[in-house]
């Protein structure tokens, strides 16, 4: 949001997705027993319904028009299989949205570091 509302870019971010993202749309519900300070309890969680192999070849490429330029500056493709830290449950329910967000963050660090000004999210610290 900081980048999009700054004058560093003209317009909005652009996205290119590659691969068959339909492979990563299934989720499943599991029930697990956990131990807490008050004893054992059961939790229900939503987990991904796809394998690591299903993620191979899936990527997003993020780009934007930098101030003073007329063409889109595209970042490098970001592959889903290469994303290790997935702290949000949205990685299970909406991986395309999450990888797009991560792609914008990487793009901004590379092409507009002056806008970020050293601000880091908790998973980057």
Model-derived segments and their meaning:
Residues 1-125:
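Glycine-rich anion-binding surface patch
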């Amino acid at each position: 949001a900081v980048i999009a509302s700054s004058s560093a870019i003209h317009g909005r971010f652009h996205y290119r997705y590659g691969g068959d993202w339909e492979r990563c749309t299934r989720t499943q519900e599991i029930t697990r027993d956990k131990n807490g300070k008050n004893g054992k309890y059961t939790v229900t969680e939503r987990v991904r319904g796809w394998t690591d192999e299903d993620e191979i070849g899936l990527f997003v490429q993020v780009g934007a028009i930098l101030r003073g330029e007329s063409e889109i500056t595209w970042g490098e493709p970001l592959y889903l299989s290469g994303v290790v830290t997935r702290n949000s449950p949205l990685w299970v329910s909406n991986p395309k949205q999450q990888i797009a967000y991560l792609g914008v963050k990487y793009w901004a660090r590379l092409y507009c570091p002056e806008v970020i000004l050293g601000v880091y999210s908790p998973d980057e610290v």
